[in-house]
């Protein structure tokens, strides 16, 4: 029987790219995108979009299907078309499964609490 998880951590790579007057943002590990007028707004809008996606997956009982990486050609297109200033950020999304709805918290720089299981088992 699988062990019931209380908290799960999802490591996320955010790509933030200047496209004309806007900033586009992409969470690579979950194939969720957003945008904003500034880099900071694009980051916050992406966090909100990722949180909505993960909450929906958890509430639908599809926790194991949350990770769905952006296809390689999608990454290449995001990075190169059109060319623009690009920033890469690393975050961890901490999901507490004991609450309904689940509670989510973004941690910077790949921080993961010691009592939290990774979302994807190491190979």
Where are these predicted regions, by residue range?
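Residue-level detector of intrinsically disordered, flexible termini
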Residues: 1, 23-26, 32, 121-122
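Short, charged, surface-exposed hinge/linker loops at domain edges
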Residues: 1-11, 40, 44-123
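A short, exposed loop/beta-hairpin motif centered on an aromatic-Gly-Thr core
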Residues: 30-41
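Short aromatic-glycine-(Arg/Gly/Cys) micro-motifs in beta-strand/loop hairpins
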Residues: 10-29
